[in-house]
Amino acid sequence: MKFALTGGGTGGHLSIAKALAIELEKQGIEAIYLGSTYGQDREWFENSPLFSERYFFNTQGVVNKSFFKKIGSLFLQAKAAFKAKEILKNHQITHTISVGGFSAGPASFASLLNKIPLYIHEQNAIKGSLNRYLSPKAKAVFSSYAFKDKGNHVLTSYPVQNAFFDCARTRTEIKHILFLGGSQGAKAINEFALLNAPKLTKQGIKITHICGSSAHERMRFFYQELGLLDKVELFAFHNNIIEVMHRADLCVSRAGASSVWELCANGLPTIFIPYPFASNNHQYYNVLEFEKENLCYVVPQNELLPKKLFEVIRKLNQKDDQGNKNLTTISTKLQQKIAKDGAKTIIETILNA
């Protein structure tokens, strides 16, 4: 028995691949990885001991491109698919798991050509174009969101690494705020952090700001101009996001699915600013259920005024009918919403199929 994991591009997809790879390793099952040279796949897995072999194809996405660029991207995908077909055959792969993203294309299609059972994890509440096409052809589609077209869909807990649960805690007071722009940074969140930093630090609230590598020097300059560089923990990227989340009492974040569920597992109340240009507005739908259950605050990017942060802080400090702070109630309920061992459930479901 040997698995192939494929897909990625961004940290959200790749964190799922990592969680599944860790579970396969625990169960003593060998796995290889197939991704792309474009995006973050190499950064995550080029030297990862979780995989016996790693392959990166020269591929790019097709969505939101001009006609001729789409043709070029499809040609690269097709070329890579035939390479992937040989790789899967040579490794005698028995199961393929796609975590989505454009880099999942070649190995997913190669698996279908080789008649290898294909399993898909759909991380978002709205399916991406590749998963929409491949879902009917897959053995099963795992997701933490309920889809209307149930078919071969399996509802599971999100495959969050156990460390996020292990470092969870119930928040009782807002002493530390984390501004989290995602793996690629977020200009709107960066500016929101800068505008609120003077008042927050004046009130004695600590700030950790992960701004993305492209904005790091600029953010450093602005904090220095504000005289706050020594009062703000500023990072382009942080290797231990679990520890950073654990220390925070409130988070401001995009609404990529992996971030949403990791914050949930950690019990960290969050203000979500969905990326407005995400395909099919999927980031908004990722947190819609949370918002309906009063487990988060959602602020559209075009309404992101500095006063919004303090409005939310004020609401979180108010007490509910039982005399508990809303902050504490939300933190407690978040930890109850997601079950541990989502990755284990997915792997065992596949093995028992």
Curated annotation (Swiss-Prot):
Q: What is the lineage of its organism?
A: Bacteria, Pseudomonadati, Campylobacterota, Epsilonproteobacteria, Campylobacterales
* CDD domains membership: GT28_MurG
Which pathway is recorded for this entry? Cell wall biogenesis; peptidoglycan biosynthesis
Top-level EC class, please?
transferase
> Which coarse location class describes where this protein primarily resides?
membrane
This entry carries the following GO cellular component terms, namely: plasma membrane
- Pfam families recorded: Glyco_tran_28_C (PF04101), Glyco_transf_28 (PF03033)
HAMAP family reported in the protein's UniProt record = MurG (MF_00033)
Keywords of this entry: Cell cycle, Cell division, Cell inner membrane, Cell membrane, Cell shape, Cell wall biogenesis/degradation, Glycosyltransferase, Membrane, Peptidoglycan synthesis, Transferase
Q: Which Gene3D superfamilies does this entry report, sorted A to Z?
A: Glycogen Phosphorylase B
Q: Does NAD show up as a keyword for this record? A: no
**Localization per Swiss-Prot or TrEMBL:** Cell inner membrane
- Which reaction does this chain catalyze? di-trans,octa-cis-undecaprenyl diphospho-N-acetyl-alpha-D-muramoyl-L-alanyl-D-glutamyl-meso-2,6-diaminopimeloyl-D-alanyl-D-alanine + UDP-N-acetyl-alpha-D-glucosamine = di-trans,octa-cis-undecaprenyl diphospho-[N-acetyl-alpha-D-glucosaminyl-(1->4)]-N-acetyl-alpha-D-muramoyl-L-alanyl-D-glutamyl-meso-2,6-diaminopimeloyl-D-alanyl-D-alanine + UDP + H(+)
- EC numbers on record: 2.4.1.227
Q: Where does UDP-N-acetyl-alpha-D-glucosamine bind?
A: T10, G11, G12, N124, S183, Q283
Topology term for the membrane: Peripheral membrane protein
Q: Which gene encodes it?
A: murG
GO MF terms, alphabetically ordered: UDP-N-acetyl-D-glucosamine:N-acetylmuramoyl-L-alanyl-D-glutamyl-meso-2,6-diaminopimelyl-D-alanyl-D-alanine-diphosphoundecaprenol 4-beta-N-acetylglucosaminlytransferase activity; undecaprenyldiphospho-muramoylpentapeptide beta-N-acetylglucosaminyltransferase activity
Family, per entry? Belongs to the glycosyltransferase 28 family. MurG subfamily.
Specify the protein name. UDP-N-acetylglucosamine--N-acetylmuramyl-(pentapeptide) pyrophosphoryl-undecaprenol N-acetylglucosamine transferase
Q: What does this protein do?
A: Cell wall formation. Catalyzes the transfer of a GlcNAc subunit on undecaprenyl-pyrophosphoryl-MurNAc-pentapeptide (lipid intermediate I) to form undecaprenyl-pyrophosphoryl-MurNAc-(pentapeptide)GlcNAc (lipid intermediate II).
GO terms in the biological process aspect are: carbohydrate metabolic process; cell division; cell wall organization; lipid glycosylation; peptidoglycan biosynthetic process; regulation of cell shape
